[in-house]
Amino acid sequence: MKYLNKTVFSLAIAGVSMLSGNLNAQFLGGHRLKSDEDGPKGQFMVYGSLDYSKLTTPSSSSSTVSSAPLGVGYFINNNDLVGVNYAYSQNTVDHNVVYKQNEAGIWYSPSVMLGKYFVLIGQVDAHYVWGQQLSTAADVMQNFNGFRLRAYPLIGIVLGGGWALKFKFAELSMLQTKTKEEGWTKSYVAGISGSTFGVGISKNLDFRKKSKNDN
């Protein structure tokens, strides 16, 4: 448990440091919207995406992991969101499903505008996970549960009308799970480019009351 706590703490610090809401406005010539600028503060955002990663071993065993996250968030200011999300994923090895997973939890996402139509986004997820995996001792599926910590960058393209396309091109995550038969196991993902890729779409929803001056 001592080593588990150290790992969780280290990954959390790394993720928050990398994706902190205090991202410098000078980075890549980007800027964060000021509090008095017209922005999405107080709006809600809903999103859906499809994530994909592939690993081929020297024995030509192909492992494909796909997931479909869905989430809703709230703009606490013009640049940062907090929210909840859910994702289902499965792992296929040589066309056989060996792993099914559900995960749900909270997320935090800071952003920096890169001009008028592009956004650099970071996201940190903290999730409870549960599902089934193929047992190493017997050819049967067994239940598991645990948690996942994840940090990743995205590039967003503003489409107008509150819509945006988002592309995930890297990921750093830790998954810790346990079963009755095997106890705790730990796995990591640290990929970039085609090894871990995702594409999604989001929509901002504005329920704020508009003053007469806004009309």
Where are these predicted regions, by residue range?
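Bacterial Sec-dependent N-terminal signal peptides
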Residues: 1-30
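Structural motif marking the loop-to-transmembrane transition
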Residues: 4-5, 64, 147
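General detector of folded, globular domains
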Residues: 33-44, 54, 75-77, 90, ...
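Generic short beta-strand segments
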Residues: 50-54, 86-90, 127-128, 170-173
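Outer-membrane beta-barrel translocator domains and adjoining extracellular loop/strand segments
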Residues: 56-64, 93-100, 132-142, 177-185, ...
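Gram-negative (and chloroplast) outer-membrane scaffold detector with strong preference
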Residues: 68-149, 157-163, 202-205
